[in-house]
Every structure is written in C-alpha cells, then in structure tokens.
C-alpha cells in the first residue's frame, strides 16, 4: 500500500500511527504533472503494478461565492478535480493491465449545492460527472470506477475550513464581508457541531473505501454516513423550490449585523 502525502513529515507521522507493516508513502503534488508522473513510475518500477487507485486529496474553501476570487476558485478545482484526473491518466496503463479499480472520493455535497460551500460543491459535482464518464469509458477495458461520498466526519479538516472561511471574508471588500459575516459565522459553527455529533468515524469511511476496492461487483456509488445518503436522496427527490427552502435557514442572516444569532 502506497500513500500519497504532501510533505515528508506527514508521511512519517502516518507510518508512526499505522500498524500496517506494508504501508509506504510517497510525496506527491497532484497539481504538478512531473510529480504525478514520478508517482506512476515509482509504482511501476518498485512495486511492479497497481490494483487500485484511491483519489482522496482535496481542499475545502468555504465562503460566499462573491468573496471567492478566480484564483481561489481555480485552486479548488485544480486540487479536487484536475489533480485527480492527472493521477488517473498517469496510472491508467497499470490499472488496465491488472483490471484494477479507481475510487474517487467526493462528498455529500456532490449531490446538492449548499450556500457558502459553492466552490467546494462545484468541485464535487465536477468529480461526480468525471467519475460517471470514466466509469462508462473504461468499462470495456475492465477498469471499474466507483465514487465514495462521505458525510461529516470529525477530523482536523473542520478547523482548517473555519480558518479558510474567515480568510475569505478578510480578503473581501469590507462592505461585502459585513453583508455575509453573521450568516457565515453561524454556518461554520453549525458545520463544526455537525461534525462533532457525527457517528461516522474515519474507520467507517476506510471500510467503505475497502468495499469499493474489493466488492466482486462494485457499485457506482457508496455512501459513508447517514447524512451523505440523506443528502443524495433529498437532492434527488425534492424539486429545486423545496431545496431552496431547505437551505434558506443558512442564508437567513445575510445582511444582519455581526454577532446576530444566525438562526432564523
């Protein structure tokens, strides 16, 4: 098993915390084609082949779309979508040889676009479409493609998300930031509370990914967490007008003074 990490220290920490004797790591920047090609060459030459590729790298940039500039939006797509496609393209020759699996990790937000997570939702929708197209294109070659969509899981990402949301407001014109500040603060606090209350653990997520890699007949989609499954079902069944009403509580305090209770 080869884990891709951004930094050497991340890889060493992973090895120290893992009890898997066969776990190794490689430093990979999925937004750099040279780094991605080096990863594929390492797998081919050192390990001789590849049975499965799990694309789990991602960033989440929260905030009103009015506060997210083009460079930030492109970064969201570059990491969460383009980088995943680069990894797939580089490793496909190995996967075709083994009739292997590709597992793309998306999110419950690949089913419905939530206010203040528009950039992230756009990336997840794109990754869902990417996965659907790949699944159909690669089926004749024996390479199977699945999506795993986790819901809220208590991990350090939520602290990073809150900090990124605060930076998005800090970088926006003051009048624009003031318009959204109260609503966004309430939204970020609600997200953190939802993650703390979630019963889905990282181990639950890992088991779901393992199923996608090993099921005799892998499904197109797997969900890790009741909230992710509920989001997908709600988005599929409700008309847009009712979905808009469902999310109205999030934006109810847009325009309210900072510190106002964000509940409607």
Report residues per predicted region:
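Conserved glycine-rich Rossmann-like NAD(P)H-binding loop of the short-chain dehydrogenase/reductase
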Residues: 1-12
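Residue(s) in the substrate-gating loop at a strand-loop-helix junction
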Residues: 107
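The beta1-alpha1 cofactor-binding region of Rossmann-like NAD(H)/NADP(H)-dependent oxidoreductases
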Residues: 28-41, 70
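Active-site helix of classical SDR
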Residues: 88, 123-126
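C-terminal beta-strand-loop-alpha-helix "lid" module of Rossmann-like NAD(P)-dependent dehydrogenases
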Residues: 140-195
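A short, exposed helix-loop element centered on a Lys and neighboring polar residues
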Residues: 88-89, 132
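Substrate-binding pocket helix/loop in short-chain dehydrogenase/reductase
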Residues: 64-65, 72-74
């Amino acid at each position: 098993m080869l884990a891709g990490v951004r930094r050497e220290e991340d890889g060493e920490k992973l090895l120290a915390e893992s009890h898997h004797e066969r776990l190794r790591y490689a430093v990979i920047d999925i937004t750099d084609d040279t780094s991605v090609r080096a990863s594929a060459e390492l797998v081919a030459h050192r390990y001789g082949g590849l049975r499965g590729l799990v694309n789990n790298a991602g960033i989440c940039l929260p905030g009103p779309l009015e506060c997210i500039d083009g460079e930030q939006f492109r970064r969201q797509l570059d990491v969460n979508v383009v980088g995943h496609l680069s990894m797939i393209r580089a490793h496909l020759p190995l996967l075709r040889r083994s009739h292997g699996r590709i597992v793309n990790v998306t999110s419950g937000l690949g089913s419905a676009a939530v206010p203040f997570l528009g950039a992230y939702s756009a990336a997840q929708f794109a990754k869902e479409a990417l996965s659907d197209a790949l699944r159909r294109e690669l089926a004749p070659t024996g390479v199977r493609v699945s999506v795993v969509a986790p819901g809220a899981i208590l991990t350090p990402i939520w602290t990073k998300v809150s900090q990124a949301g605060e930076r998005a407001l800090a970088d926006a014109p003051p009048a624009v930031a003031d318009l959204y500040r109260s609503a966004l603060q309430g939204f970020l606090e609600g997200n953190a509370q939802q993650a703390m209350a979630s019963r889905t653990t990282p181990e639950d997520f890992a088991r779901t990914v393992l199923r996608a890699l090993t099921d005799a007949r892998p499904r197109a989609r797997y969900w890790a967490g009741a909230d992710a499954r509920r989001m997908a079902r709600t988005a599929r069944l409700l008309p847009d007008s009712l979905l808009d009403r469902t999310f109205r509580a999030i934006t109810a305090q847009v325009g309210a003074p900072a510190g106002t209770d964000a509940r409607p």
